[in-house]
């Protein structure tokens, strides 16, 4: 059995703008697969059998298949293999699930109990919909009078209007210069994991930074009913992903039918 050692593949991913987190995830699946099968000689049957792991949820299985698909796309182009053994594997269906947004009282509780820096981080998630990595890497150069320029997944950039709640603290951050949230060395950015933990500690009842992103999406959608705008603000490549963020509860469904009936 072989272990994973294809630095050229990692370079290929980096050149394509794949984030460090995604690269690490893909390599972890490839390492696990290579402990059971040689990557250069694995067959379609080997891959299907490995993906049948009964302990995996559909989302895990989909991520594992995606990692193998990515590797064999490169391997075929690089002539490491003669054919792609993942080509005949079936896509994994993952049922969509609505993720709950943090309630407003959880947000208010968090904002009351933290210092200015953590308060700004929380508000960037709740009032700009930024991911934890996007918050961690925010630089003064990304801040304009009315807009933020955000670099998200896949190194894609988007522009997000600055909510009135964010105007003053972001203006101060702009004046200070450099990264808004700095690490222990005083100049480089904090890590995404550290940022996520910092926000989660401030929130009650096990809510997370991601639930604040849902809070932002839900409020923007309810105010505008413009799902395309929400998609752009969140930086989603697929509107199907945005639909998970804009789950409509039963009360809203009743109001919609009631409005038509009246």
Predicted feature locations:
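Conserved catalytic core of the tyrosine transesterase superfamily
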Residues: 1-262
